[in-house]
């Protein structure tokens, strides 16, 4: 089965996401909670990160029990684990973005993660990465210097030959400077005014 998924652009947690995360949750021979399915969340807002750092909401657990999707025993174990096993803080990026600055977003998310881990006494660490605007080795080094456990790149990968895009597009991206980009309406959310 699929053991790792990426959960991006969520505004709130959903029952299918929680069902996936909890599928197969159990205690091992040493009593340790094992949650075989991993959710890697990508968020740019603190209130959304808080949901992913926390255990699943009781309302969703109740619904999943009533639907026969999880057992009472699984719901009990669910209260001991975060929804996300890893979380990527998405700063200003080339896709849908909330225009967050990496210098303020990552430290805020690290603080929230640490606070939540202490509050719920999690035994496994929640890895925290950074995405958005990471296009150079220096930007990658800066992310790690600020405390990121990993980085996630996106648009910069379109400049690679493996991207399958045209030579012209790859050349334009490789030559682009910071001042050469601007926000534009998002094609799939144009009617809502999203950039």
Each model region followed by its residue ranges:
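Catalytic or ion-translocation cores adjacent to nucleophile or general acid/base/metal-coordination motifs
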Residues: 6-7, 11-14, 92-93, 108, ...
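Active-site entrance/lid segments in N-terminal catalytic domains of soluble metabolic enzymes
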Residues: 1-125, 138, 157
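Glycine-rich beta-strand-to-loop/alpha-helix junction loops that act as flexible
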Residues: 1, 127-135, 153
């Amino acid at each position: 089965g699929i053991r790792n998924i990426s959960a991006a652009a969520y505004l709130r947690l959903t029952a299918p996401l929680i069902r996936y995360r909890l599928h197969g949750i159990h205690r091992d021979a040493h009593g340790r909670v094992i949650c075989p399915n991993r959710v890697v969340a990508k968020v740019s807002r603190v209130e959304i990160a808080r949901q992913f750092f926390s255990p699943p909401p009781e309302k969703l657990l109740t619904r999943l029990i009533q639907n026969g999707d999880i057992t009472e025993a699984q719901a009990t174990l669910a209260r001991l684990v975060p929804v996300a096993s890893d979380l990527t803080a998405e700063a200003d990026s080339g896709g849908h973005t909330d225009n967050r600055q990496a210098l303020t977003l990552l430290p805020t998310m690290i603080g929230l993660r640490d606070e939540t881990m202490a509050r719920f006494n999690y035994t496994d660490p929640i890895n925290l990465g950074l995405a958005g605007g990471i296009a150079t080795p220096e930007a990658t080094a800066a992310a790690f210097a600020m405390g990121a456990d990993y980085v996630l790149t996106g648009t910069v990968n379109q400049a690679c030959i493996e991207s399958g895009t045209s030579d012209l597009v790859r050349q334009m991206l490789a030559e682009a400077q910071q001042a050469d980009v601007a926000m534009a309406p998002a094609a799939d959310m144009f009617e809502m005014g999203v950039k």
